[in-house]
């Protein structure tokens, strides 16, 4: 049994050595923007590509271009590999959709799956719109709220951002009313407040936005019966996705070997137990017969 367990353990070890790097090699890295993906004109932005796979190089590419691919050697810190790409002071020709890739030492010309796309937007190019709330900036809990973004400029699209959230909502501008173009953003029943801003843009330059509207603080008063967190609000019950991915992957790999080891131990213990019972069988029978004989003698004495 011992030789079999050792053999299976060796097979499993070499299988893991061959399979684990390939799985990690296929896993896509993550791409972040610092200080954020909405960048004012002439402001510096850094794009960070990172992964829990130990990539040797990272590549950064902007969609629609062929000569803008950047390549950096990855830094390995605390089980994470990363590279920081500085794209300089923000200009209109630097705005767009970016993705990054990773490569490992033994396959320098083969790349991982691409990261999720990251849209880098330049702001501050046009006149700022106005942002207002209906029925007002202070509402009762559960009361419906609509934010209206409007401008004298003929923007095709309006974008609404919430402080602390990564993504924006967008709506097409409606017909011109009283000399202004407007888009309404229904927020539904109010459960929590927040600070909002809006921007305007044109169809032919979707990554070039206007200046930000003045911030609008929406306050909610009262205690709603059912208050739900924002979809982007982190839950205390939700762990780090990277750590969960590694934990689940390791558990799946270990499970077959654990089952096999349990089966072999169970079989070995069963064989040992059966052998022990067979050795003790005759002695057990003799003991039972002796007790029966004593009982019969006792009964004979009682009735004599």
Curated annotation (Swiss-Prot):
Glycans are attached at residues 67, 84, 178. It is found in: Cell membrane. Its main location: membrane. It is a single-pass type I membrane protein. Disulfide bonds join 49-100, 149-198. Residues 1-21 form the signal peptide. One of its GO terms (cellular component) is plasma membrane. Residues 22-245 are extracellular. One of its GO terms (biological process) is cellular defense response. Keywords: Cell membrane, Disulfide bond, Glycoprotein, Immunoglobulin domain, Membrane, Receptor, Repeat, Signal, Transmembrane, Transmembrane helix. Residues 288-304 have a biased composition (Basic and acidic residues). Pfam families: ig. Gene3D superfamilies: Immunoglobulins. Coiled coil: none annotated. Residues 220-239, 275-304 are annotated as: Disordered. The chain crosses the membrane at residues 246-264. Residues 265-304 are cytoplasmic. SUPFAM superfamilies: Immunoglobulin. Residues 42-107, 142-205 form the Ig-like C2-type domain. Receptor on natural killer (NK) cells for HLA-C alleles. Does not inhibit the activity of NK cells. Belongs to the immunoglobulin superfamily. This is Killer cell immunoglobulin-like receptor 2DS3. The gene is KIR2DS3.
């Amino acid at each position: 049994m011992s030789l079999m367990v050792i053999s299976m353990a060796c097979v499993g070890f070499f299988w893991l050595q061959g399979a684990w790097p390939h799985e990690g090699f296929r896993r896509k890295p993550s791409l972040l923007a610092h200080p954020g993906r909405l960048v004012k004109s002439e402001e510096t932005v850094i794009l960070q590509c990172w992964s829990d796979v130990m990539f040797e190089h990272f590549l950064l590419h902007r969609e629609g271009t062929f000569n803008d691919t950047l390549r950096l050697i990855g830094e390995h810190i605390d089980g994470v590999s990363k590279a920081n790409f500085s794209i300089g002071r923000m200009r209109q020709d630097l705005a767009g959709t970016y993705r990054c890739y990773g490569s490992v030492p033994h396959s320098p010309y083969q790349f991982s799956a691409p990261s999720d796309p990251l849209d880098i937007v330049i702001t501050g190019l046009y006149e700022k719109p106005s942002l207002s709330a209906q029925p007002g900036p202070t509402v009762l809990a559960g009361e419906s709220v609509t934010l209206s973004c409007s401008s004298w400029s003929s923007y095709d699209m309006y974008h609404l951002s919430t402080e602390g959230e990564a993504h924006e909502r967008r709506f097409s501008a409606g017909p011109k009313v009283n000399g202004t173009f407007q888009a309404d953003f229904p927020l539904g029943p109010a459960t929590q407040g927040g600070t909002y801003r809006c921007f305007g843009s044109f169809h032919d330059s979707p990554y070039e936005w206007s200046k930000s509207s003045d911030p609008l603080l929406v306050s909610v008063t009262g205690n709603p019966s059912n208050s739900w967190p924002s979809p982007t609000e982190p839950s205390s019950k939700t762990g780090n996705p990277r750590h969960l991915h590694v934990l689940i992957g390791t558990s799946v790999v270990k499970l077959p070997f654990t089952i096999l080891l349990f089966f072999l131990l169970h079989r070995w213990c069963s064989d040992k137990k059966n052998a022990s019972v067979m050795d003790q069988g005759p002695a057990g029978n003799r003991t039972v017969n002796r007790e029966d004989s004593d009982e019969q003698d006792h009964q004979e004495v009682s009735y004599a």
